[in-house]
Amino acid sequence: MTAKLIDGKAIAASLRQQIAKRVAERSQQGLRTPGLAVILVGSDPASQVYVSHKRKDCEEVGFISQAYDLPAETTQTALTDLIDRLNEDAAVDGILLQLPLPAHLDASLLLERIRPDKDVDGFHPYNVGRLAQRIPLLRPCTPKGIITLLESTGVDLYGLDAVVVGASNIVGRPMAMELLLAGCTVTVTHRFTKDLAGHVGRADLVVVAAGKPGLIKGEWIKPGAIVIDVGINRQDDGKLVGDVVYETALPRAGWITPVPGGVGPMTRACLLENTLYAAETLHD
C-alpha cells in the first residue's frame, strides 16, 4: 500500500480561485474591495520571503494589500500606534503582523492590540477562546487549512483517534481544538512525550508540528492512518523536509501531505479566506 497524496498546492489554488471570483462579484455589485495590511519588522530573510508570498497572493485574488516594512529598531510604541491606526481604517479588513519580531518587542501585547475582527491570523485570545468554546469566528490559519485538507480526503473524522505532535500556540493547541470540534478523540503530545512512538502508533490521524526534522519515524505510523506534516525544515543541502520521515511513512499511511506543497500553501490560502470572511461578515 502506498499513501494517497493530499495535494495542498492544488487545493489552495482552487480556494484562491473561489476567493478571486467572489472579489470580482463584489466589485460588480459595487461593494468594497477587501484589504489586508501586512506589517514586517526587520530584515529576517525567511520573513521577507513569507511576506512577499502573502502580498503576491493578495494581488492574485484582487485584494488591496497595504505594505508596512519597518526597520528592526522600531519601538513598541511606534508599532502599537500603527496597529491602532489600522484598527480604525475602514479600508483594512485584516492586519497581519509577521512573526518572529525582533527580541525587544513584545509580540503577545502587539497581537492582542489587533482588533479581534481584524485578526485574520486567528491569534488573538478572543478568537482562540471562541474556538475553544466551539463558536469559532476567525480561526488560526494553519489548523483551519489542515481541516480543509482533511475534508478533501472524504474520510469521516468523527470518532477517529487523533494525535497532535507539538503544542505551540500557532499550530498544536488550536489544532487540537479544531479536531475536537470535528469529533475526534484528541491526544496532544510533544517531542519530550514518554513513548511518543506508542501514541503515534495507535493514531488514525497524526498532525505533526514539532519543528524537528525526522522526529516521527515511518514505522511508527499505524497502517492506513492519515499523516499531516506541518514541519518545514531546511537541510544543509538546501532540501526542505518535514517532521515525518516521508520515505518510510509513505508505504504505511493511507493519506499523507508532502513537504513542501502540503500544509504551507493552505496556511496562505486560509489567510485570504479569513480576510474575505472579515470583509463580508464582520465589516460590510
From Swiss-Prot:
Reaction catalyzed: (6R)-5,10-methylene-5,6,7,8-tetrahydrofolate + NADP(+) = (6R)-5,10-methenyltetrahydrofolate + NADPH; (6R)-5,10-methenyltetrahydrofolate + H2O = (6R)-10-formyltetrahydrofolate + H(+)
Binding site for NADP(+): 166-168, 232
Matching InterPro entries: Aminoacid_DH-like_N_sf, NAD(P)-bd_dom_sf, THF_DH/CycHdrlase, THF_DH/CycHdrlase_cat_dom, THF_DH/CycHdrlase_NAD-bd_dom
GO terms under biological process: L-histidine biosynthetic process; methionine biosynthetic process; purine nucleotide biosynthetic process; tetrahydrofolate interconversion
A GO molecular-function annotation: methylenetetrahydrofolate dehydrogenase (NADP+) activity
Any single Gene Ontology cellular-component annotation: cytosol
Pathway the protein acts in: One-carbon metabolism; tetrahydrofolate interconversion
Superkingdom, natural source: Bacteria
Pfam families (alphabetical): THF_DHG_CYH, THF_DHG_CYH_C
Keywords associated with the record: Amino-acid biosynthesis, Histidine biosynthesis, Hydrolase, Methionine biosynthesis, Multifunctional enzyme, NADP, One-carbon metabolism, Oxidoreductase, Purine biosynthesis
The keyword Amino-acid biosynthesis appears for this protein: yes
E.C. number(s) listed in UniProt: 1.5.1.5, 3.5.4.9
Job of this protein: Catalyzes the oxidation of 5,10-methylenetetrahydrofolate to 5,10-methenyltetrahydrofolate and then the hydrolysis of 5,10-methenyltetrahydrofolate to 10-formyltetrahydrofolate.
PANTHER family, sorted: C-1-TETRAHYDROFOLATE SYNTHASE, CYTOPLASMIC (PTHR48099:SF5), C-1-TETRAHYDROFOLATE SYNTHASE, CYTOPLASMIC-RELATED (PTHR48099)
Subunit and interaction comment: Homodimer.
Family: Belongs to the tetrahydrofolate dehydrogenase/cyclohydrolase family.
NCBIfam families for this protein: PRK10792.1, PRK14186.1
Stated name of the protein: Bifunctional protein FolD 1
Species the sequence originates in: Pseudomonas savastanoi pv. phaseolicola (strain 1448A / Race 6) (Pseudomonas syringae pv. phaseolicola (strain 1448A / Race 6))
Lineage: Bacteria, Pseudomonadati, Pseudomonadota, Gammaproteobacteria, Pseudomonadales
